[in-house]
């Protein structure tokens, strides 16, 4: 970090930044291959319940239009 930036930061901001750096240093790291495999399995498991992929039944949808408006 630039020394001039440290002079402009107050003590509380520096403490927060140190806490954040400690948190990030203690995070469990996964190889990308493991992360991709986990994400893929999650998507495949939850694909059945995703309303954007499998649209819900229109009969049970309270916001779906019931019929067309006829004027006459």
From Swiss-Prot:
Pfam families: G-gamma (PF00631)
InterPro entries in alphabetical order: G-protein_gamma-like_dom (IPR015898), GGL_sf (IPR036284), GNG13 (IPR039227), Gprotein-gamma (IPR001770)
Superkingdom of the organism of origin: Eukaryota
SMART domains (alphabetical): G_gamma, GGL
PROSITE patterns: G_PROTEIN_GAMMA (PS50058)
Location of N-acetylaspartate modifications: 2
Topology of this chain in the membrane: Lipid-anchor
Modified residues (Cysteine methyl ester): 69
One GO cellular component term noted in the UniProt record for this chain: cytoplasm
Subcellular location: Cell membrane; Cytoplasm; Cell projection, Axon; Cell projection, Rhabdomere
Name assigned to this protein: Guanine nucleotide-binding protein subunit gamma-e
Organismal lineage: Eukaryota, Metazoa, Ecdysozoa, Arthropoda, Hexapoda
């Amino acid at each position: 970090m630039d020394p001039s930036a440290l002079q402009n930061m107050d003590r509380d901001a520096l403490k927060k930044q140190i806490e954040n750096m400690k948190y990030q240093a203690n995070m469990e790291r996964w190889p990308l291959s493991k992360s991709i495999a986990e994400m893929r399995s999650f998507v495949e498991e939850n694909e059945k319940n995703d309303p954007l992929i499998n649209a819900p039944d229109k009969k049970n949808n309270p916001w779906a239009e019931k019929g067309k408006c006829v004027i006459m």
